[in-house]
Amino acid sequence: MAREKFERSKPHVNIGTIGHVDHGKTTLTAAITMAMSVFSGAGAGKKYDEIDSAPEEKARGITINTAHVEYETENRHYAHVDCPGHADYVKNMITGAAQMDGAILVVSGADGPMPQTKEHLLLAKQVGVPKIVVFLNKKDQVDDDELLELVELEVRETLDNYEFDGDDIPIIPGSALLALEALIESPEAKKGDNEWVDCIYSLMENVDSYIPTPERDTDKPFLMAVEDVFSITGRGTVATGRVERGVVKIGDTVELVGLKDTTETTVTGLEMFQKTLDESVAGDNVGILLRGVQKENIQRGMVLAKPGSISPHTKFEAQVYVLTKEEGGRHTPFFPGYRPQFYVRTTDVTGKIESFVADDGSASQMVMPGDRVKMLVELINPIAVEKGMRFAIREGGRTVGAGVVSEILA
């Protein structure tokens, strides 16, 4: 059977459920897919157990269990990621295996914010999830409305602590389980038929309006990491790689950033699969012919970018997940002063880990396999670094950690 064509009639947004274990993330995900199936043939409703048996994925050699579902609202098409285990969230958010343009934080009205609620919020902040909408679940288990209001206040305070806009964020109370049961009983339930199903509609209306449509990759400033370089006699030097974002046209001025002093050059030709192009866009694997650049002045690990859009750095702070030995990581802890390779985009750069910081701000002296930690890194060579950039930490050819840049220092 022929594959269905992916119809791009609505803007696409990546979203995920986050929150403490057993607060109802997967149940809510199931309820959303069932309620939203009225808007589309896309993403027929998924039952709880279809979501919970999440397949394993490998991102940078790390095994992550994530479940992907899709659904549509009146205004948008969503790809929704739900992770069964807490460790999966940590790995997913740090490796960016499933990018999130926004998140639904699920908090049980019976318990209020718990340790993982806070840990997921901290991670969401540091990996750059821009906006969050809250679903206050298990409302049916709270008899007293005042208690629910207290929990809501506590949630808003917690959001403020992690620099999300606690006053402004929509918080929708409801019961994912009762909504799901109502939808299983009458899958045709529309808005106004059932108070619990209405909570799901209300949640998604808030997600539609509060979580911004992400800027498309093609609208961002041009960037391509250089993978290979060769010279064509009589024509000049060609740098090849995959365009990470933006658009590049013949005649554009671009900057070569990283490893050496930043220089400017002009694009004189573009080729893809032996054909010439006038312009190349995000996602293309392309060869870029550059004017007046010697082959020895470009090397793998540099980037070609729109002038002024990215600069070379050597010092940054990052949130890192350290692989367990079962995942192929180290068997032993490491300490400040450890000098592994940092694999960024297309190249390894040696760097020194100067210090580690725990979530509460205290300095830790040692990092164990399986830990998540904030670290201060100094690279021996400057490379193009920006906030939110992902990297892997390697040692002797194997990945021992994955990280995301949270702050640039120098």
Curated annotation (Swiss-Prot):
Keywords annotated in UniProt: Chloroplast, Elongation factor, GTP-binding, Hydrolase, Magnesium, Metal-binding, Nucleotide-binding, Plastid, Protein biosynthesis
Subcellular location field: Plastid, Chloroplast
Name of the protein in question: Elongation factor Tu, chloroplastic
Annotated region (G4), positions in chain: 137-140
Pfam families recorded: GTP_EFTU, GTP_EFTU_D2, GTP_EFTU_D3
Gene Ontology cellular component annotations, sorted alphabetically: chloroplast; mitochondrion
Gene3D superfamilies per UniProt: P-loop containing nucleotide triphosphate hydrolases, Translation factors
E.C. number: 3.6.5.3
Its biological purpose: GTP hydrolase that promotes the GTP-dependent binding of aminoacyl-tRNA to the A-site of ribosomes during protein biosynthesis.
This protein's record includes keyword Protein biosynthesis: yes
Organism of provenance: Oltmannsiellopsis viridis
Presence of keyword Chloroplast: yes
Enzyme category, top tier: hydrolase
Lineage of the organism: Eukaryota, Viridiplantae, Chlorophyta, Ulvophyceae, Oltmannsiellopsidales
Positions of the UniProt region annotated as G5: 175-177
tr-type G domain span: 10-215
